[in-house]
């Protein structure tokens, strides 16, 4: 048997590729980061084979580039992701997310009494690292949650 080195997800001419997303996290990223709020073509690969992760997800968005803030906010969900900026089918920049100090507009506060759940305000969380565990503190109710609690609420 010969190994076939074909791309499993079609290459894009210009745009962003988010690679090395943990398996089953790709759809959540599309929703949370509002990546589908575009008329550009989006290609998603789910449960693709990965030497590092075993399985991974992949997102390709044509003619769209993530801001540095968006790239860094990915670190909460996909700390080992790589974000590639593509032009003329070539990688022109390769970025790794860095944990930001703050995450805005992406997450929902788990506190059902928080004003951010009922008022037209953008959510905002301070990111804290405590003993190798991430905690997120809501700007409005000032409650602090383990990051997995906020993620499950997303």
Swiss-Prot record:
Binds 1 zinc ion per subunit. GO terms for cellular component: aspartate carbamoyltransferase complex. GO terms for molecular function: metal ion binding. Zn(2+) binds at residues 109, 114, 138, 141. One of its GO terms (biological process) is pyrimidine nucleotide biosynthetic process. NCBIfam families: ATCase_reg. PANTHER family: ASPARTATE CARBAMOYLTRANSFERASE REGULATORY CHAIN. This is Aspartate carbamoyltransferase regulatory chain. The gene is pyrI.
């Amino acid at each position: 048997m010969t190994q076939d080195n074909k791309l499993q997800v079609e290459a894009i001419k210009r745009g962003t590729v988010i690679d090395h997303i943990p398996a089953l996290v790709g759809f959540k990223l599309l929703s949370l980061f509002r990546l589908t709020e575009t008329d550009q073509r989006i290609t998603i690969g789910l449960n693709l084979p990965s030497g590092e992760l075993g399985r991974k997800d992949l997102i390709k968005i044509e003619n769209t580039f993530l801001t540095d803030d968006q790239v860094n906010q990915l670190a909460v969900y996909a700390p080992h992701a790589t974000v590639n900026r593509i032009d003329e089918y070539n990688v022109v920049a390769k970025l790794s997310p860095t944990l930001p100090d703050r995450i805005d507009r992406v997450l929902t506060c788990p506190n059902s009494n928080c004003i951010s759940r009922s008022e037209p305000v953008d959510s905002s969380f301070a990111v804290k690292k405590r003993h190798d565990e991430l905690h997120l503190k809501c700007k409005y109710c000032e409650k602090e949650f383990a990051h997995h609690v906020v993620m499950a609420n997303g």
